[in-house]
């Protein structure tokens, strides 16, 4: 079983988009893959339970089926930071609870588990703990999605520096253009290639529609076939 954690430089960096495409790429190569969205806020009621749109996308993209509460064990209605939403709901999120939920995912029989984080890298799960501590404890290799927009240099470099300080195994990063009108897009991309200490896996240009899977040819070569 191969396991990966997909994080982003910020909220809306494109984590779900990338995780979904990775799941589809693995499916193309006959791999049994499942997505895991441990924490989600901004959920809505459906079928008598809170569900998250991003988690549903991961379920639709996966080749291994599982019940919703296995894919997204912590779901909250307010579109706010999960640890604040959890406190309001009277729910305590701990690393042990996350690991217990993750064991349920491992029992689904997948060859690959792709865990999508929430928000950016430094996401609190409580007043005293962060999601990245759980990622380190589980020894998950990380893929960083850089949302290409104004401010991405600072966000990406700070994230990378923190990962390195923790000894996190970041296997690479993906440039995802979220702002179609970004000034000096190529110059920013070149700056990130020069400065980030991890290899670039793929570039996803901005599109009103979901980019074709061919965009991820490099990602396919680096991830789906060689991991």
Swiss-Prot record:
Mg(2+) binds at residues 16, 54, 116. It catalyses: (7R,8S)-7,8-diammoniononanoate + CO2 + ATP = (4R,5S)-dethiobiotin + ADP + phosphate + 3 H(+). Substrate binds at residue 41. Its EC number is 6.3.3.3. CDD domains: DTBS. GO terms for molecular function: ATP binding; dethiobiotin synthase activity; magnesium ion binding. Keywords: ATP-binding, Biotin biosynthesis, Cytoplasm, Ligase, Magnesium, Metal-binding, Nucleotide-binding. InterPro entries: DTB_synth_BioD, P-loop_NTPase. It comes from the Bacteria. Its cofactor is Mg(2+). One of its GO terms (cellular component) is cytosol. Pathway: Cofactor biosynthesis; biotin biosynthesis; biotin from 7,8-diaminononanoate: step 1/2. It holds the Pfam family AAA_26. SUPFAM superfamilies: P-loop containing nucleoside triphosphate hydrolases. GO terms for biological process: biotin biosynthetic process. The active site is at residue 37. It is an enzyme of class 6 (ligase). ATP binds at residues 12-17, 54, 116-119, 176-177, 205-207. Disulfide bonds: none annotated. It is found in: Cytoplasm. PANTHER family: DETHIOBIOTIN SYNTHETASE. Homodimer. Catalyzes a mechanistically unusual reaction, the ATP-dependent insertion of CO2 between the N7 and N8 nitrogen atoms of 7,8-diaminopelargonic acid (DAPA, also called 7,8-diammoniononanoate) to form a ureido ring. This is ATP-dependent dethiobiotin synthetase BioD. It comes from Pseudoalteromonas translucida (strain TAC 125). The gene is bioD.
């Amino acid at each position: 079983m191969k396991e990966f954690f997909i994080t982003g430089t910020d909220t809306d960096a494109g984590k779900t988009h990338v995780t979904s495409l990775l799941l589809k790429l693995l499916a193309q190569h006959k791999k049994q893959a499942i997505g895991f969205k441990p924490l989600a806020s901004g959920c809505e009621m459906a079928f008598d339970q809170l569900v998250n749109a991003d988690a549903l996308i991961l379920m639709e993209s996966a080749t291994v089926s599982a019940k919703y509460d296995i894919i997204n064990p912590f779901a909250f209605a307010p579109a706010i930071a999960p640890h604040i939403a959890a406190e309001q709901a009277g729910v305590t999120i701990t690393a042990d609870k996350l690991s217990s939920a993750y064991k349920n995912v491992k029992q689904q029989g997948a060859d690959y588990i792709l865990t999508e984080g929430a928000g950016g890298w430094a996401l609190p799960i409580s007043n005293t703990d962060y999601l990245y501590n759980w990622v380190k404890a589980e020894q998950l290799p990380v893929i960083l999605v850089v949302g290409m927009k104004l401010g991405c240099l600072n966000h990406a470099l700070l994230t990378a520096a923190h990962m390195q300080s923790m000894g996190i195994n970041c296997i690479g990063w993906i440039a995802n253009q979220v702002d179609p009108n970004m000034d000096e897009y190529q110059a920013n991309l070149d700056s990130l290639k020069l400065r980030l200490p991890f290899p670039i896996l793929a570039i996803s240009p901005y599109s009103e529609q979901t980019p074709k899977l061919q965009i991820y040819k490099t990602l396919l070569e680096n991830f789906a076939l060689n991991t």
